[in-house]
Amino acid sequence: IKLDDSDRPLPGAVFNILKDGQLIGTEATDASGKITVTNVTEGMYTFVEVSAPAPYSKLTSPVCAHVDQAVVNGGGTVTVTAKDQKLPNLTIKKLDKQNKLPVAGTVFEIKGIHYGYHQDVTTDTSGKAVLTAIPVDSYEVTEKSVPDPYVLDETNTQTIYLGPGDDQQLVFENLKQPQLTISKIDADDS
């Protein structure tokens, strides 16, 4: 039985099925989250998830069940339950450092440290850029460009680990470029 992180059946998860270490088939869970293995004989059965339906992450460890001769002779059933968690989400928020108002148009580079994920995102009018269902990994988030009149801080990189089911937020703040206004008047206008 394949369940999601809320204990509801999860259809469409694909598993390799092994008996005593030998591949005997590949099956997908049905609408009720189940795979039924028929003609079972005594031995160790291992279920290795090959793919999980979006937005879930596949299991990183196999699920095992031993079927003994008493179960086979008695026509019994062995139930194995596997539970998936959703892939993580990341919200990047950009604020003006002085007035804390959102800043639209900031471009961020997101790099997965271990598995090669890479994407650039731009903050919207609410100052946010949202990444949904991204791989479980540690990420470096770096500001690439900012709209005028803000000052780019190229050393402003934040690192975050996103685990299964996480919904995290990073906040970046920038100062505006200082402005100097010079007014030229003649001596008669003092």
Which functions belong to the PLM regions below?
Residues I1-S190:
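Solvent-exposed loop/turn and edge beta-strand elements of beta-rich ligand-binding domains
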